[in-house]
Amino acid sequence: MKRIAHYKNGNYFVDLYEDGTKVRYNDLDNLTPEFVESMDCKISNNCPYGCRFCHEKSTPDGEHGDIMNAEFIDKLRPGTEMAIGGGAVTGHPDLIPFLKKLKSIGVIPSITVNQREYKDNFDLVNRLVEEKLIYGLGVSFTSFDDEFWDNAIKNNPNLVVHLIAGIHGGDVFDYFANKGVKILILGYKDFGRGHDLLEKARAIIQVQIDWLKNNLQNLLSKYTVISFDNLAIEQLDVKSVLTDEQWKEFYQGDDGTHTMYVDLVNKQFAKTSTSTERYPLLSNIDDMFKIIKGGN
C-alpha cells in the first residue's frame, strides 16, 4: 500500500497510507503531539435534505462558510487530515478551489456526503475522486439501493459507509456485510436536531443502540474494516469486545489529544462538533490546538 504522508509530530512519527491507515510510532511509552493531526471541518450549514437527527441543524437556507479566507489554513502542515462536512458540502461554491488549495499545501482532505447528495451530484463527487482532490469519501446511508451502492463502492476504493448507532438497525448492517465495504459507526449525537429527535423517540433509539452493542462481536467478524468515532466507542463499549493488544493497536486517542473541530460558517473551533465550549477562530492553527489540548 502506497504511503502518502510521513512526518514527525512531537515525540513520535506518523505514516499515513492511501487506504486511510494511520500508524503512529516511537520508542517511548507515550505519544505526545506538538500540533493537530486531523480535524473535522464544517464548511456549510446549507442542506436541502432535512435529516431528522442532524446535529448541525443544517437547513436549505443555511449559510456557506468563507472558506477561502481562513488564515489558519495557511499554517496547516503537510500530512494534516481534514474531514470536510456540512451541511451539503457539494453545494458550496468554493469547494473545488478550497480542495485545490489544500492539495497545494499538502493537506489530505476527505468529504462526507449524504447518499441523496451523492446521487444528486454524482459527476461532481466522482470528479473529486478521479482528480485526487479528496482521498476519502464518507457516504451517509439513507436508503437501500443496490445499483447506487454497487457502483459507488466499485468506483471508489476509499469509500466508507457512515452508519449511526440508534438510527440504523440490523437490516442495514446485514445489507453492507455482503458488499465488501468499510463502515464507520458514529455515536448518536444528542445535539441539534439529534436532541429533538431523542426527546420524541428515546426508547426506539435506545433499543437500536442496545441491539448494536449486543451484536458488536458478531458484526466485527462479518466486516473486513469497521471503525468507530469516540462517541460510538463510548456508547457501544467497544473496548469490551477487544483484547488489550487490539485496543492498544487500534484506539487513536481521546478527542482533543490529536484532533479538533473547526466551524468555518460561524468562525469557531472546539474539541468536537458537539462541544458547547467554543472559541473564535485564530490566525494560527497551533495556537488553536494549544487551547484544545489545554482543555483536556
Model-identified regions with their sequence ranges:
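Flexible mid-to-C-terminal extensions adjoining Fe-S/redox cofactors in radical SAM and related proteins
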Residues: 1-24, 261-296
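Non-core capping and flanking segments associated with repeat-based/extracellular domains
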Residues: 47, 100-102
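Residue-level recognition of short loop/turn positions
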Residues: 50, 86, 265-266
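Radical SAM enzyme [4Fe-4S]-AdoMet core and its adjacent flexible, acidic
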Residues: 133-286
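Core AdoMet radical
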Residues: 38, 56-67, 78-92, 102-121, ...
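Ankyrin repeat (ANK) tandem alpha-helical domains that serve as protein-protein interaction scaffolds
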Residues: 71-75, 96-100
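Canonical Radical SAM [4Fe-4S] cluster-binding loop centered on the CxxxCxxC motif
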Residues: 29-68
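Short amphipathic alpha-helix with an adjacent loop that forms part of the alpha/beta core around
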Residues: 72-75, 122-129, 150, 173-174
